[in-house]
Amino acid sequence: MADNAAKADSTAARPANTLQSLAELDGKAPSRRQLNIQHWNTAEGARVLFVEARELPMFDLRVTFAAGSSQDGGTPGLAALTNAMLNEGVAGKDVTAIAEGFEGLGADFGNGSYRDMAVASLRSLSTKDKREPALKLFAEVAGKPTFPEDALKRIKNQMLAGFEYDKQNPGKLAGKALFGKLYGDHPYAHPSDGSAESINGITLAQLRAFHAKAYSAGNAVIALVGDLSRAEAEAIAAQVSAGLPKGPALAAPAQPTDPKAGLTHIDFPSKQTHLMLAELGIDRQDPDWPALSLGNQILGGGAFGTRLMSEVREKRGLTYGVYSVFSPMQVRGPFMINLQTRAELSEGTLKLVQDILADYLKSGPTQQELDDAKRELAGSFPLSNASNASIVGQLGAIGFYNLPLTWLEDFMQQSQALTVEQVKAAMNKHLSADKLVIVTAGPKVPQKPLPAPTDKPSEHPLGVPEH
């Protein structure tokens, strides 16, 4: 015991960026950066999370707004279109001048819109001569976009072309139908980018009104990581916050109601059939997340060796990949299982997947499966804060979902302490094999029986998966 404690102390005392020997690593997780998260609020009400990281002369800034498609109201696609238009124009600069402005400083601007959130991000060198002009331009783009009319037409056309492309993609069609069935009239039901009908009618006035409301400082979380002092970080956060519209945080959407279980088929002329199975999962505040995350890792969250992959691909050759995932969101996000298989084997494959889920819920994981999943988690966990980019993403999520600052460490400790019974209980509390909403997309063809399981399946998945 004392020996182990001494070894642990010597490892802990050594800086995290020094090399570890292979002997030291044997059976243990690699060392990971301990995050010293500093936090405060700006005068306008934005929440700020900051980690000082001096290794490289650069910094990452990520501003997260509760401005995703769940805030679209009756206008699907409004949030996505607003976000896409941010860097299309500011006073005195069009989209090309903005891009050249960032590029000339060696800076990267990024933006994105999802169901819960919209994001604007900046990566820049930290020297004052590069940092200050990059931040000035970023503050204008995020806080004072001009929404030029010609750009709106161009981006609408790009989105409309995307919708046309989606019609040729059975996976996209199935995914859209699945969210519609799973969420009904809830704001999560419609696609983040809206539809051809809704996008066409969106006006500049609607974009400006949405930006003024949803891109307000009170509705923002500012995450900063990099080569900055606390004083510099405070100045950056104050500058960004002051440049945003004034206003409060927007309310989260209501919790969704449980959907009606059942199967919907979309007829599509393809060789393969897409199978999507889902039910409502959890929100990001749910205390069962560590148990569900580990339980899902064993079911279908990893690559080879999961219950689903072993039975469906390795023993029967029915698919290239079958995956399950919980997506916790502001309110209950989906639990999903996705795969593609030969059209003539689709009904049998669907039943097999349902049986695997039912059996897993009934029996729970084995001790060996749980131990392996814990070891895999411990090995991959350091990657969650190995780079500034990954840290700034974690900070953004912690701030946006109002998680404890120790959330990453807590998650790891709670996961490693879980028992087989706790994982089984959590999976059964949140999932039920007979409550699945199922969407399939593919041709109607005569069905064949599934091959028997074997170590060397004679069936091979068809070609490259269709997307």
Q: Language model features by range: what are they?
A:
Residues 15-40, 180-220, 250-256, 381, ...:
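Histidine-acidic residue clusters that define the catalytic metal-binding segment
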Residues 138-147, 241-248, 355-364, 456-460:
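A common structural junction motif
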Residues 1-108, 121-126, 132, 136, ...:
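His/Glu-rich zincin catalytic helix
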Residues 99, 153, 200, 208, ...:
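Generic structural signal for individual residues within well-ordered alpha-helical segments
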Residues 167:
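Short conserved segment of the HATPase_c
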Residues 89-92, 142-150:
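Short, polar/flexible loop-turn hinges at active-site or ligand-entry regions and domain interfaces
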Residues 51, 56-86, 95-142, 156, ...:
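M16 family metallopeptidases and their MPP-like homologs
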Residues 5-9, 150, 380:
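Non-catalytic accessory/assembly modules
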